[in-house]
Curated annotation (Swiss-Prot):
The keyword Transport does not apply. The active site is at 11 (nucleophile). Keywords: Hydrolase, Magnesium, Metal-binding. Its EC number is 3.1.3.-. SUPFAM superfamilies: HAD-like. This is Putative phosphatase HI_0597. CDD domains: HAD_Pase.
Length: 272
């Protein structure tokens, strides 16, 4: 069978998932049909693998791969670690000292042991209601830095993160990757960590290349993945900074309409 692409690579929030952060029925049917045709399903997200495992379980894609924490980890559906790039522990401890207004910003970390945050914000759970993935409130001044995938800051508004971003880039810009995964979520990973880099590492063990992938995304943490794939598609409601960074890429519909699934059905000739 002559397939237009060997792999479908997609971001989750704002892209593959509905605005309620759930997997739509059309999306489930589409990804199952693609896997039956031999197309690899690769989900690339800022989320933790515990989150993504639950989503993949609902999709039912048996051979799917998870690129998580913006590329800091790659796992198969069985949870086997295929690639890892952690922040150095001593660097993490310095990141914990980042100054910010605690009334407007919260600090978080994804580590091998789970999700940690400096304050209890129940609204954050809405992003994880499908998986039940939950946070632990800690005092970061006393918390360890082992096995850290990323440290990230969530503001009430994008403006709340301006000073945090300036501080991080000035102090850690040379040794980390700093990127927005959403308008008010600023994330810090180890140097050269991105979804695109993780995809490159994954494909070293596959019989096809980046040009054989179609990718979908909506945030600044998708730039490399979308730019390097054979076909990159940006969501209609994507971060305007992404559209400006990748003006050559096609803009498709919104996640509300399950536009990734609809686009894939057209590309691969799947009936409704």
């Amino acid at each position: 069978m002559n397939l237009p692409f060997r792999a479908m690579v997609s971001d989750l929030d704002g892209t593959l998932l509905t605005p309620e952060h759930l997997v739509g029925d059309l999306t489930i049917d589409t990804l199952r049909a693609l896997e039956q045709k031999g197309v690899d399903i690769i989900l690339a997200t800022g989320r933790n693998h515990t989150d993504v495992s639950s989503i993949l379980g609902k999709i039912g894609a048996e051979r799917a791969v998870m690129i998580t924490s913006n590329g800091a980890r790659v796992r198969d559906l069985q949870g086997n670690l295929l690639y890892s790039n952690s922040l150095p522990e001593e660097l993490v401890l310095e990141l914990y000292k980042t100054p910010f207004d605690t009334s407007k910003v919260c600090m978080n970390s994804y580590q091998d042991e789970g999700w940690f945050t400096n304050k209890d914000i129940p609204a954050m759970r809405q992003f994880h209601k499908e998986s039940g993935f939950d946070y632990n409130v800690v005092d970061f001044s006393k918390h360890h830095g082992r096995g850290t995938e990323k440290v990230f800051f969530i503001g009430k508004t994008p403006e709340d993160l301006v000073e945090v971003e300036t501080y991080l880039r000035d102090k850690f810009g040379d040794v980390t990757t700093i990127v927005y995964s959403a308008l008010a979520c600023l994330e810090v990973m180890n140097k050269n960590v991105s979804k695109g880099d993780a995809l490159k590492h994954l494909l070293e063990s596959r019989e096809y290349e980046l040009k054989d992938c179609i990718a979908f995304g909506d945030g600044m943490n998708d730039v490399e993945m979308l730019s390097w794939a054979g076909k990159g598609c940006i969501m209609k409601d994507a971060d305007i900074r992404l559209k400006m960074a990748c003006p050559e890429l096609e803009v498709i519909g919104s996640n509300k309409e399950e536009s990734v699934a609809r686009y894939l059905r057209t590309q691969f000739g799947l009936d409704y």
